[in-house]
Every structure is written in structure tokens, then in C-alpha cells.
A protein has these predicted regions:
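Positively charged, amphipathic and often flexible ligand-engagement surfaces
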Residues: 1-258
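Non-catalytic terminal/interface segments that mediate subunit docking, oligomerization
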Residues: 253-272
Length: 272
């Protein structure tokens, strides 16, 4: 008999709060105390660090009461274009960080928090990345904290396979993801492919620079500088939502109105 593990993925920002609430409330129901499940948190959302803390506090109480641990996948996030479209349409602040440096800094901050011995025994981690610098960072943090048995690396089949093989030589467990689609659902495979192509071609993305990655090369120097900058920023990166709309406190001054200076400006929708 093969044991099943249910893992909730994360897509748009609007699903973050409700997915977290559903995850916690479901596992609090009678009959689920001794079942484990997991969900993903996207580091490109500044809210995710606080959500990780919230889930960890809850999971530690659950574990102390005899319940099973849960699992969190710490990922970078791959739906930026969708978030940008929503932000533009509704005239809302962009929910994710608008630069990769803060994304990587938040990812490292979440990894450090999650790998504290008092946390990771209640919340096991899936460390999702193909970035050799970030993988090495997580590996060293786990060894320093003595928690290597409580996390797995996660990679996508066919991407950076030589890095995956190097990790396997260390003895650290790896979960490899591969998409599966029937002929009738092949359109979803196209969407998946486009996301992977976007990841591979982003100017600051590790995979774009991978083929030119040699010691002291331009790509090596760029990635090294980026990694060091993200380390310096990780304890200062913003935490919490970018959107703070409150209709009760807004000021409706004439000079900010719709027809000020004969220019039409659409009123943003209320973000419920």
C-alpha cells in the first residue's frame, strides 16, 4: 500500500490567506490529527514570511499535543506576469516584490526560520530551487543546525540534472517533480512549458547563466554579487502585505478626484 501525501500548491496572491486558513482548519478537524499534509509558500510574496511563522506556531502546538508534523515547500514563485496583470487592471499595488533581490532575500530568511531545530521538527521543509548558491546555502544551514533529516531538496525533472546528481552524492534526499498530462489536457502542458521557459530566460535567473557559469566568468561574478547582496538584505526585507486599502480612512480631496484637471482616473476596485 502506497501512502498518499496531499500537498496544496500556491498560485495567485488572492489565494494565500484562504489556502492557509483551509489548510489549518482541515487538519484541526477530528480524525486528521495524526495525518500529515503540506502546502507551498512563495518567497516572492512578502506576506509569506509571516504566514510561515503563523503555520509554524500552530504546528508546534499540534505536535506538542501529539499530532503529526506538516510540511511547507519554500518556493520562489512563478506567477509574476499574472500578478502584474491583476495589479494593472484593478490599479492595486503589486502584491509580490518587484525585484529578484528581495525575493531571494526573503527565501533565505524563510529557510533560516524554518530550519531552526525547534521549528523544523513540527514543520518539515521542501527546499525548492535550482540555484546552486541557494542550494549550498540551505545545505550548510541544515548541517549547522543538525536538521538535515527533516528536509528535502525539490527540483524539476530535466532542469539542472547535473546539480541534482551532485546533491544526490551528498546523501541528501531529493524530490523530483515531473508534469503529467493526458492528450485531452495537453493545453495545460503548454502553459507549464511557458512558465519553465520564462524561468530559464529571466535576465537575473540562475538557469539563464548556468551554461556560462565558470570560475571568475562574468556570470559567476554577477551571481556571486547577487547572492551576497541577498544575504545582506535578508533580515531587512519587507514582511507583510503591499496592499493596505481601507475605504474608511481614505481622503476624498478635490485634487485627487476623478475629474481633477479634466483628466479621468478610474477608481480602483475595493480589494476584499
Amino acid at each position: 500500500r502506497i501512502h498518499k501525501f496531499v500537498n496544496l500548491d500556491m498560485e495567485s496572491y488572492r489565494d494565500l490567506a484562504i489556502t492557509t486558513a483551509a489548510f489549518i482548519r482541515t487538519l484541526e478537524q477530528d480524525g486528521f490529527k495524526y495525518y500529515s499534509a503540506g502546502m507551498a509558500l512563495q518567497a516572492y510574496l512578502p506576506d509569506s514570511y509571516l504566514m510561515l511563522q503563523k503555520i509554524t506556531h500552530w504546528a508546534r502546538k499540534r505536535k506538542a499535543d501529539g499530532g503529526s508534523p506538516v510540511k511547507i515547500r519554500i518556493v520562489k514563485g512563478a506567477n509574476m506576469e499574472m500578478e502584474q496583470v491583476e495589479s494593472a487592471i484593478f490599479d492595486w499595488p503589486l502584491a509580490p516584490f518587484d525585484n529578484k533581490l528581495e525575493v531571494d532575500a526573503n527565501w533565505k530568511r524563510m529557510v533560516e526560520y524554518g530550519m531552526k531545530p525547534e521549528n523544523i521538527k513540527s514543520v518539515r521543509l521542501g527546499i525548492a530551487s535550482h540555484n546552486l548558491f541557494d542550494i549550498a546555502y540551505a545545505y550548510l544551514v541544515s548541517r549547522q543546525n543538525g536538521v538535515a533529516e527533516y528536509f528535502t531538496f525539490e527540483m524539476i525533472e530535466g532542469m539542472a540534472n547535473h546539480i541534482r546528481r551532485a546533491i544526490q552524492e551528498t546523501g541528501q534526499e531529493i524530490v523530483v517533480y515531473a508534469p503529467v498530462a493526458t492528450k485531452a489536457q495537453f493545453i495545460y502542458a503548454i502553459a507549464y512549458l511557458i512558465r519553465r521557459l520564462d524561468e530559464n530566460t529571466g535576465p537575473e535567473n540562475f538557469l539563464r547563466n548556468l551554461n556560462q557559469l565558470e570560475d571568475k566568468s562574468r556570470s559567476w561574478q554577477f551571481l556571486t554579487a547577487h547572492f551576497q547582496s541577498s544575504i545582506q538584505l535578508k533580515d531587512r526585507a519587507a514582511a507583510g502585505p503591499h496592499r493596505h486599502q481601507n475605504r474608511l480612512t481614505e481622503i476624498y480631496a478635490n485634487n485627487t478626484g476623478t475629474f481633477y484637471e479634466a483628466e479621468f482616473k478610474n477608481e480602483p476596485n475595493t480589494d476584499w
